[in-house]
């Protein structure tokens, strides 16, 4: 259990260090615009999957290549910043969860709009039925 806590703490520190490096040391504007969303670290701390996202989806491929070229820089900077026996091998992965979440949000909005239209149609039908029933009731009373 203690090992899992350490893994989480080191992963959190890796995320902070890489985010700071992106903001302060990276001159490539597209790469610097990437946001680190999560770090998944192996139990032995030797491998790290760094999940990132970017505002412009069309830049994702460029950013992926830039991260690949910059792995050495990130590893050496991590070694200087954190006192780890082994600096993990880094694998940068585009995080699709935000895109997926946005697609789901869009589908939910479409479903809500469709439901709203159905409810409006049902309300109109009910009102017409009430009017018809009122007319019939009045006609019966007059007889």
Swiss-Prot record:
Domain of life, per lineage: Bacteria
Region annotated Disordered, chain positions: 123-143
Matching Pfam families: RBFA
One BP annotation, GO: maturation of SSU-rRNA
GO MF terms held by the record: ribosomal small subunit binding
Keywords, comma-separated and alphabetical: Cytoplasm, Ribosome biogenesis
Gene3D superfamilies recorded: 3.30.300.20
Keyword Cytoplasm carried by entry: yes
Any one Gene Ontology cellular component term annotated for this protein: cytosol
Locations listed in the record: Cytoplasm
Main location: cytoplasm
Assembly and binders: Monomer. Binds 30S ribosomal subunits, but not 50S ribosomal subunits or 70S ribosomes.
Function: One of several proteins that assist in the late maturation steps of the functional core of the 30S ribosomal subunit. Associates with free 30S ribosomal subunits (but not with 30S subunits that are part of 70S ribosomes or polysomes). Required for efficient processing of 16S rRNA. May interact with the 5'-terminal helix region of 16S rRNA.
NCBIfam families listed in its UniProt record: rbfA
Entry similarity comment: Belongs to the RbfA family.
Protein's recorded name: Ribosome-binding factor A
Annotated organism of origin: Francisella tularensis subsp. novicida (strain U112)
